[in-house]
């Protein structure tokens, strides 16, 4: 199993819990870029190759195929 290219679940949670109004412009940009890359990596990885944590993260944050 590999989580290569995936955003850490803790980072995802922190990003979602912090309102954009409390983030700097570079932080907002970083979140958008890393969220997009994580979503693409999740869609490119088969369910059999995902760890339990990534499967749960995809289900919670809507990044599953």
Curated annotation (Swiss-Prot):
Which keywords fit this entry according to its UniProt record?
Answer: Stress response
Bias type Basic and acidic residues, positions: 1-17
* Compositionally biased tracts (Polar residues): 18-27
Do you know which InterPro entries this protein is assigned to? HSP9_HSP12
Induction is noted as: By temperature-induced mass conversion from opaque to white colonies. WH11 is abruptly activated at the second cell doubling.
Highest taxon of source: Eukaryota
Chain residue ranges for the region called Disordered: 1-32
Q: Which Pfam family would be a valid example here?
A: HSP9_HSP12
- What name appears for this protein in its UniProt entry? White colony protein WHS11
